[in-house]
Regions:
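N-terminal glycine-rich FAD/FM-binding segment characteristic of electron-transfer flavoproteins
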Residues: 1-104
Length: 104
């Protein structure tokens, strides 16, 4: 494991029925503070179905980038499917820090 391969601050941007939850904006704010100190980017992980058009809202609240996983399998929140999707993003992108709500 080479630490230089791990970078940026990732946030799980929670949504319910296409509505971004306030906790996502709170996490983005804290992530922005940390990323600024570390001179890194804030990357939001945004999962669900029919949500692509909401990604810009996350940029407006502090994300530098949004990874959108928009698929019918994620229409309803099922922790196993969401956990697998988030785990795959983390394995692929190697964030230095990750902010998730405790009940993912």
């Amino acid at each position: 494991m080479d630490k230089k391969d791990y970078k940026n601050v990732f946030v799980f941007a929670e949504q319910r029925e296409g509505v971004i939850q306030p906790v996502a904006f709170e996490l983005l704010g804290k992530a922005r503070d940390l990323a600024d100190v570390l001179e890194e980017k804030v990357v939001a992980m945004f999962l669900g179905y029919g949500i692509k058009d909401k990604a810009q809202e996350l940029i407006e609240h502090g994300a530098d980038e949004v990874i959108v996983v928009d698929t019918p399998e994620l229409k309803d929140f099922l922790s196993e499917q969401y956990s697998q999707a988030v785990s795959q993003i983390i394995l692929d992108r190697k964030p230095a820090n990750t902010a998730l709500r405790g009940n993912l």
